[in-house]
């Protein structure tokens, strides 16, 4: 982790990855690739994937909205593509002041 101007910037590594929301939604969804990353984390020390954050960004886009069904659908799809991979979901809500 790097701290710049009082902001923590997570560096992608063997324990942490950021993925665009496009990786798990719409025609660009690539669940086999996401499942592969989950298996890699499970085979190591575990890890964290934050969805909805674009490469080079530290927060999701301000206008981004996530369908409330998406997290459960994601877990079900990953479970269907893997064996013995435990997924723990957590959610974060980011609020900004646009004024």
Task: Go through each PLM region and give its residues.
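Conserved N-terminal catalytic/coupling substructures associated with nucleotide/phosphate chemistry
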Residues: 1-99
